[in-house]
């Protein structure tokens, strides 16, 4: 109010006072308007914070605003302020506070007679009442009533356009559907939640909704989609600084990684989750993470004995067990006891049995079928190890029945595999085969939904015992029966399982499935990864390996998503596989033999295929072969190793690995090797033949046969069924001695460190390769003028290689440094030059090569250790040769170890001379090696490293 002024007579003074009155009156009005304007701004700021999901920040603004003297606010502003407070409390899950705030809003609206706000508050209070009643019914397990009441609240919110009220009711309904196993309703509800969360910019709920959709696909055993949604949830949570609010996304992602065989990535996510739960003093969740972490570390060490873990599985589980007993959580205790029993089976049967019996007893008490089925399976395994086969069968069957009841596919296939092992020990091979087939069929349902080869390889990693078991029992049946039908069945099984991921991906690429390499998101993620390598502080950091793993897999997810978008209508049809008769009549030539190897825990096999024969030879167990091969490779790769040592070990391996009738045969003229496991790193050409009559000198295998290598029978067969190209515009493309800038040399340290844990003290040197430059020049000179293109030093850039139409070249020769990573196989790379200011870093990685297309007759990787990579049993080596074969090259020559570049030049020149003279690829390589054997460079170090993979025939 304006204070009443006293009366004044006219004159100068009254006029002056009038102006003063007008001035102060106007100022008061301006102050009031400014106050209202400032209040409106703050209310709008709070509203925008709320709409962006920043509820706590919004509350701080509002509480400061409404705490000022009531006289400075009008009722409408107060009502609006308290309405925002109520909605913030609602969104934060503080329902009682939200209810009280809505009651106050209703009172303020009554005072102002603001019908709109009054109706909003009244409707909100009714929704809260329904929400609380539905939650009570859910706690009482009156699920139908709870669902109906939640739906009433949701419909009321929808009718009035109250999205925030609808969102929270939907969230609770979603939890109800999960609890009662209504998975399709759960999925639909999760999609609705995601849509509303995005509409409201509620990032917290968006993360939770993505996590829910991931959980749905995980439950449905669609591991690719569950990985995708969990990955999106975590990425968004990190971006919005919400990860501490949703650590469950990390544990969910870890579970999917575990099921995909990505154990080290699972460890990384679990360790991140553990830090959050410990900080929050969430003991139950901490215990859950501890036992999951222990199991992930155990499986990773089982897969890679050299794996370094900060904590040992048994110590983690013991800690988790003590904590579970302290908080009296019997459900967690039962699971931990089971896991303790599981990791003790190989070392302490009695101790393992004690843990498992305790776990089973608690599982039965709690009626926890997951614990019961797992404990029964582990107890069955103990009985099998003790040769109590009938008891083991009984326990496996009980475990199988329980696992089926809860649709636990992982447990079901393990039970079938256990039963197969039992029947195999009883000599009932047909029954064993049936159970192995059941195990295979069970996890194939999960595998069929995995949409990327690298993830399929990880998934297959834990299923080797089934793959090996199928082949092993068929070998037993073949040995005992000699039935041609069994031969066909064994052949088909080998064909089905060997390098199957390679064949599946080859079919996919033929259908045109390629990612959009220009995607902004992909380019951004590539930049993040490259930036990671540019920071020296990442070297030696204990979490750096996990961080790089996470970045790599995020890149893959973006890539896979783009592929899926471009191929939604794609049909998944596999190319037909050859029959044994077809292989022998239409593929194998007179004089050609194939040796196909399978390494096994108890015994290994060599399968000999020729036009007239299919024989099986029994070999020593994998560990014996592996020990001898590692020693031999060490001798081969050392140019000063003793000749006698080479002869001794080479002859022993020759006796083990080469069938005597093959070596003695005068009818075999060429040999193809399909290696398994460590044999992928063995140059069979160097094996000594000791079957000659006394007095004959001991010769290398290469002196008798030309040798080539293949990934599988099916892949070799398929390469011959496709017509070769004839319309090449150029004969030869050569890249040699790329000149690396200092930036690339600096990055090399980081890349080597993450590639193979190489010591930081062993600083890498990217030395120039002057002979490689001479190599490609001299090779190119063998071809007609204008028949080839050469790029070397500064011109041998990654940009240049990618810019070329590679399909126009018959032969591509890359003489450069190579970087092979067994820990990050998709980051293995060829090191080319890079231009200043270019977006390309000079490291041509496997996943970049995947985006290229070839139709070359031959790729020559004249680079250090370019044959190496991640060795996967049955699948082969995941590395550079494989990817070049996959994208369209008919064959690849690569090296098994670092070779002197002058010796490499000599070998390559001789090889190309033979090739251009019309020799088959494997024969040209053989002649080049024989020439070196007869020279001063006769040591295998100089000539044995280079091997031919793929189609071995003539080019000219």
Language-model regions, residue ranges each:
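Functional beta-strand-loop-alpha-helix junction segments that form "active/interaction loops"
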Residues: 573, 577-582, 643-653, 763-827, ...
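Conserved alpha-helical positions within TPR/SEL1-like repeat arrays
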Residues: 43-51, 80-91, 119-139, 165-179, ...
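Eukaryotic all-alpha helical interaction scaffolds
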Residues: 50, 62, 69-70, 89, ...
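A domain-level signal for caspase-like cysteine endopeptidase catalytic cores
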Residues: 230, 270, 631, 658, ...
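Catalytic cores of nucleophile-dependent amide-cleaving enzymes
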Residues: 716, 810-910
């Amino acid at each position: 109010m304006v204070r009443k002024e006293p009366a004044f007579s006219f004159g100068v003074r009254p006029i002056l006072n009038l102006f003063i009155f007008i001035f102060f009156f106007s100022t008061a009005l301006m102050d009031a308007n400014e106050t209202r304007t400032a209040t409106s701004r703050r209310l709008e700021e709070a509203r925008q914070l709320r709409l962006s999901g920043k509820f706590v920040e919004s509350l701080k603004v509002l509480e400061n605003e409404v705490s000022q003297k009531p006289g400075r606010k009008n009722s409408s502003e107060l009502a609006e302020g308290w309405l925002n407070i109520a909605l913030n409390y609602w969104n934060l899950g503080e329902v009682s506070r939200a209810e009280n705030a809505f009651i106050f809003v209703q009172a303020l609206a009554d005072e102002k007679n603001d019908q709109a706000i009054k109706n909003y508050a009244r409707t909100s209070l009714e929704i809260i009442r329904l929400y609380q009643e539905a939650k009570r019914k859910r706690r009482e397990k009156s699920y139908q009533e709870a669902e109906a009441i939640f739906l009433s609240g949701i419909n009321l919110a929808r009718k009035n356009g109250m999205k925030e009220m609808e969102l929270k009711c939907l969230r609770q309904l979603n939890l109800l559907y999960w609890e009662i196993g209504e998975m399709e309703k759960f999925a639909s509800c999760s999609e609705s939640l995601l849509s509303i969360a995005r509409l409201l910019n509620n990032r917290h709920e968006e993360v939770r909704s993505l996590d829910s959709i991931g959980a749905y696909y995980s439950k449905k055993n669609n591991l690719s989609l569950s990985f995708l949604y969990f990955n999106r949830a975590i990425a968004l949570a990190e971006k919005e600084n919400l990860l501490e609010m949703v650590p469950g996304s990390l544990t969910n992602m870890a579970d999917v990684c575990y099921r995909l065989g990505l154990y080290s990535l699972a460890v990384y996510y679990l360790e991140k989750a553990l830090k959050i739960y410990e900080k929050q003093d969430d003991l139950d969740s901490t215990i859950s993470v501890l036992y999951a972490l222990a199991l992930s570390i155990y499986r990773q060490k089982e897969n890679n004995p050299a794996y370094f873990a900060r904590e040992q599985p048994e110590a983690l589980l013991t800690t988790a067990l003590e904590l579970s007993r302290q908080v009296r959580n019997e459900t967690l205790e039962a699971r931990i006891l089971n896991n303790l029993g599981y990791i003790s089976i190989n070392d302490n049967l009695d101790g393992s049995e004690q843990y498992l019996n305790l776990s089973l007893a608690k599982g039965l008490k709690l009626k926890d079928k997951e614990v019961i089925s797992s404990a029964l399976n582990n107890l069955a395994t103990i009985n099998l190890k003790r040769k109590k086969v009938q008891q083991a069968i009984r326990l496996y069957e009980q475990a199988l029945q329980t696992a089926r009841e809860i649709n636990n596919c992982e447990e079901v296939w393990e039970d079938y595999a256990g039963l197969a092992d039992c029947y195999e020990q009883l000599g009932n091979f047909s029954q064993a085969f049936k159970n192995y087939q059941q195990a295979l069929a069970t996890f194939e349902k999960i595998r069929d939904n995995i949409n990327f080869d690298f993830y399929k390889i990880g998934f297959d990693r834990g299923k080797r015992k089934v793959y090996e078991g199928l082949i092993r029992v068929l070998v037993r049946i073949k040995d005992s029966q000699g039935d041609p039908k069994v031969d066909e069945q064994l052949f088909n099984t080998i064909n089905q399982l060997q390098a199957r991921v390679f064949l599946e991906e080859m079919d996919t690429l033929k259908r045109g499935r390629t990612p959009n390499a220009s995607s902004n998101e992909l380019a951004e993620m590539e930049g993040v990864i490259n930036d990671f390598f540019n920071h020296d502080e990442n070297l030696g950091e204990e979490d750096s390996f996990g961080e790089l793993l996470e970045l790599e897999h995020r890149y893959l997810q973006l890539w896979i998503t783009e592929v899926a978008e471009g191929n939604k209508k794609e049909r998944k049809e596999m190319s037909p596989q050859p029959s044994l008769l077809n292989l022998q009549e239409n593929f194998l030539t007179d004089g050609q033999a194939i040796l196909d190897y399978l390494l096994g825990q108890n015994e290994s096999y060599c399968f000999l295929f020729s036009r007239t024969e299919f024989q099986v030879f029994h070999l020593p167990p994998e560990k014996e072969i592996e020990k001898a091969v590692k020693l031999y490779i060490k001798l081969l790769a050392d140019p000063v190793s003793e000749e006698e040592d080479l002869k001794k070990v080479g002859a022993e391996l020759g006796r083990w690995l080469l069938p005597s009738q093959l070596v003695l045969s005068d009818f075999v003229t060429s040999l193809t090797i399909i290696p398994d496991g460590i044999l992928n790193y063995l140059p069979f050409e160097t094996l000594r033949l000791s079957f000659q009559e006394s007095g004959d000198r001991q010769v290398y295998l290469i002196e008798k046969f030309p040798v080539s290598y293949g990934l599988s029978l099916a892949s070799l067969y398929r390469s011959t069924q496709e017509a070769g190209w004839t319309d090449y515009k150029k004969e030869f493309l050569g890249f040699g001695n790329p000149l690396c800038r200092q930036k690339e040399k600096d990055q090399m340290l980081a890349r080597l460190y993450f590639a193979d844990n190489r010591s930081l003290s062993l600083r890498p040197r990217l030395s120039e390769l002057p002979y490689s430059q001479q190599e490609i020049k001299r090779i190119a000179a063998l071809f007609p003028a204008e028949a080839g293109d050469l790029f070397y030093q500064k011109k041998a850039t990654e940009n240049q290689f990618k810019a070329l139409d590679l399909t126009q070249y018959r032969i591509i020769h890359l003489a450069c440094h190579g970087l092979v990573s067994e820990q990050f196989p998709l980051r293995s790379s060829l090191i080319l030059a890079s231009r200043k200011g270019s977006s390309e870093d000079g490291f041509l990685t496997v996943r970049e090569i995947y985006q290229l297309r070839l139709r070359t007759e031959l790729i020559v990787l004249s680079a250090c250790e370019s044959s190496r990579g991640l060795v996967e049993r049955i699948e082969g080596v995941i590395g550079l040769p494989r990817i070049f074969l996959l994208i369209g090259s008919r064959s690849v020559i690569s090296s098994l170890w670092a070779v002197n570049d002058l010796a490499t030049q000599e070998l390559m020149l001789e090889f190309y001379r033979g090739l251009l003279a019309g020799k088959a690829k494997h024969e040209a390589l053989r002649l080049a090696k024989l020439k070196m054997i007869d020279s001063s460079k006769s040591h295998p170090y100089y000539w044995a490293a280079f091997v031919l993979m793929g189609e071995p025939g003539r080019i000219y």
